[in-house]
A protein has these predicted regions:
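Sec-dependent N-terminal signal peptides
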Residues: 4-13
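Secretory/extracellular carbohydrate-interaction modules
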Residues: 52-120
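Flexible glycan-contacting loops in extracellular carbohydrate-active proteins
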Residues: 173-202
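Exposed low-complexity, polar/acidic, P/S/T/G-rich flexible segments that act as propeptides
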Residues: 198-216
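Short, aromatic/His-centered strand-loop micro-motif at the edge of beta-sheets
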Residues: 125-149
Length: 250
């Protein structure tokens, strides 16, 4: 029994260790992971990946390889020093479901920012013009400059849950079902900044952690307890009348 416990104690940390951990605190963007793409449009500043892009372009991005599994978790922190919009926002492309045999390609991504001040989880099929919004939530934090931590989970190739950090705890903001193919073994994780000419710089990412295991389930929003229905008043207790005792007469 002791040997079994020792083996489990050794294996559990290995199972829980993330497959990708990017702190963005090295000398180069590629110090910890093999990022490719528009590397010349980003710099590392005090532990943040920060955009320094070309104003004539509408978007820049970097990407790194990722292995897919049935159950996954993505966690990351982003910052924008301005109010995001439809033109100026951040996307993290988390899963590219490339089913080549069927000619299907679905790009799943989290978008932080829109004209409606929302965070969304979207699915964009290559053959369609517009993405499908799977989860959408308006957040007060998106009314101005943004610093936000986000968590996304995938369960059994199908169930997606999106969380944001509020007051020190991850809170569920939405769930959906959208099945991905088990035959797709991996793809590219892509961090993308979309911008107008006046908002080229100061998109930033602090860290990205991706695991094949879902951490302890974050707390869900508090729901007000339904008031208990008042109990019906008990019927008054009726005592039997005592019979008058008559004196015995001879």
């Amino acid at each position: 029994m002791k040997q079994l416990l020792l083996i489990l104690a050794f294996l559990l940390p290995l199972c829980a260790y993330p497959q990708l951990k990017e702190p963005f605190n090295g000398l180069e963007i590629t110090s910890d992971n093999p990022w490719t793409g528009d590397l010349d449009c980003f710099v590392i500043e005090t532990g943040w990946l920060v955009s320094r892009a070309d104003p004539t372009r509408k978007s820049v991005s970097i990407e790194t390889p990722l292995v897919y599994s049935a159950t996954m978790e993505w966690e990351f922190e982003i910052r924008m020093d301005f109010k995001p919009s439809d033109q100026n926002h951040i996307r993290l492309h988390v899963y590219l479901d490339d089913q080549r045999m069927l000619g299907l390609k679905n790009d799943y991504y989290v978008q932080i920012g829109s004209n409606k001040k929302t965070i969304t989880f979207r699915k964009h099929t290559a053959t369609e013009k517009n993405p499908k919004i799977l989860i959408e939530k308006a957040l007060d934090v998106l009314l101005g400059a943004v610093d936000l931590k986000v968590k996304l989970t995938l369960e059994n190739h199908k169930i997606w849950n999106l969380y944001v950090l509020e007051k020190g705890r991850f809170v569920l903001i939405g769930s959906c079902e959208s099945e991905v193919s088990s035959s797709c073994k991996g793809g590219q994780l892509r961090f993308e900044c979309r911008y107008s000419k006046t908002r080229v710089n100061d998109f930033a990412c602090n860290y990205i952690i991706i695991s094949d295991n879902i951490s302890i389930e974050p707390e869900k929003p508090d729901t007000p307890e339904e008031p208990e229905e008042p109990n019906e008043p008990d019927e008054p207790l009726v005592l039997p009348r005592l019979l008058a005792i008559q004196p015995i007469t001879e």
